[in-house]
């Protein structure tokens, strides 16, 4: 991204791991609220410091970061001019009701962050703080990235947001990988992803794109 003319800000918002138990616990129950506030505060700081152009800011994330990216577009639609939403949890209640089997030992930690699907008050908050239920608030262009083999959040969440956004006439684009899951593993897919992201940002923010077109036909050929 820096090579394409963008300043990049990676935020360790509250609730992030690797910064101590107190910092992590500060995110419990704060998804879509204070955890999101941290992203907004960091963005406003970058604007105030003259690092960021307030008219050319995008938000990007994958997995929970994809959730945060989607929430940024529906919760703070005047701040972000574009969003890239990758492999995202978009319906918190759905995710809580149908967690992947691999999460068996970590469901207690999940509930600390997002609540208990069997508690009515928690369910209400899940619905209120799920991007899928606030697509009508989106103003910025969005690029949805997903893998049809995603066994963590389930590709259907991505499909639902794309469908809803199109029905509402939103500026929505998508990059879907048939043979990828919760992330992008194949180098050919990574090339497609990098190209689409830089083209998307160039269109909506004005950065550079191109100058490596020769590698794409090679990737497409080797992928067949």
Which residues does each PLM region occupy?
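Active-site-proximal cap/loop segments of hydrolase catalytic domains
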Residues: 1-4, 9-224
């Amino acid at each position: 991204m820096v090579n394409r003319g963008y300043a990049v800000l990676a935020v360790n918002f509250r609730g992030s791991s690797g910064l101590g138990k107190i910092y992590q616990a500060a995110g419990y129950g704060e998804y879509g609220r204070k955890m999101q506030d941290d992203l907004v505060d960091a963005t406003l700081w970058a604007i105030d410091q003259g690092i960021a152009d307030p008219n050319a800011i995008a938000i990007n994330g994958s997995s929970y970061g994809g959730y945060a990216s989607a929430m940024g577009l529906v919760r703070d639609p005047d701040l972000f001019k574009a969003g890239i939403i990758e492999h995202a949890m978009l319906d918190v209640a759905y995710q809580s009701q149908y967690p992947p089997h691999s999460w068996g030992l970590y469901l207690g930690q999940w509930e600390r962050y997002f609540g208990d699907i069997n508690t009515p008050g928690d369910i209400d908050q899940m619905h209120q703080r799920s991007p899928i239920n606030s697509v009508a608030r989106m103003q910025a262009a969005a690029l949805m990235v997903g893998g049809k083999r995603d066994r963590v959040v389930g590709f259907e969440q991505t499909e639902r947001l794309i469908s809803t956004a199109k029905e509402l006439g939103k500026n929505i684009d998508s990059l879907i990988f048939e043979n990828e899951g919760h992330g992008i593993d194949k180098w050919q897919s990574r090339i497609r992803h990098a190209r689409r992201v830089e083209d998307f940002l160039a269109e909506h923010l004005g950065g550079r794109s191109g100058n490596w077109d020769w590698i794409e036909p090679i990737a497409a050929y080797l992928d067949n």
